Amino acid sequence: MSELFPRRIETDRLTMLPSTPEVLSPLDFYRVCSADPDIDEVTEHLTWEPHAHPKETLEFLRATSEGLESGDDAAYQVYVDPGDAPEGVDGPSPGGPYADSDLVLAGGAGMGVDWDRRTGTLGTWLRKPFWGRGYSGERAAAFVALAFDRLDLEVVAVEHVAGNENSRRAIETYVERFGGWKEGALRNWAFEEGEPVTQHRYSIAREEYEDADVEVAVEFHG
């Protein structure tokens, strides 16, 4: 993977590892992306739908791996310690260089980087048992620090489609925490099930991040 992005990101409760076929078995990930309880609800407002077959999952992981290698997409899988996992959720765990770990997959996180615009755009998803635990904000804080402190970007942006109230609440909380604000609504900007929908956009500028002076508990390894 690109030397621009860390090989491991750690916060108080989360461990984020590169989204590659070497780290997460495509077959294990397929079982999450195709048949996890509530997967239809989880993907309702995402850019991907439940996977139809294992090859789709392999192609998904190869695409995120290529984004990491090119330096254009910091794509990670989000894990928690087994003691923090909800009852009944016991995997999957990472493999490859992390095969000795018993971490439990909670979801995914990433930041697409537009180097010409010095802008990183955040994205995330979580398996439903992990909703409502503040993980989205904790993950966001780590990526905001990654954008400004390591990658020297000038703006961090995040968007959600109209009607995604869970994302709206989480985004408004952490954007305000870092001094950012809502830029506005982009009508018919995104698509859901082939239909145009309104997209709401928020951003944090470097100056706002520095003025907010928020201490972010995160460690970047590699």
Protein language model features and the residues they cover:
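Glycine-centered recognition micro-motifs in short, flexible terminal segments and loops
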Residues: 132-138
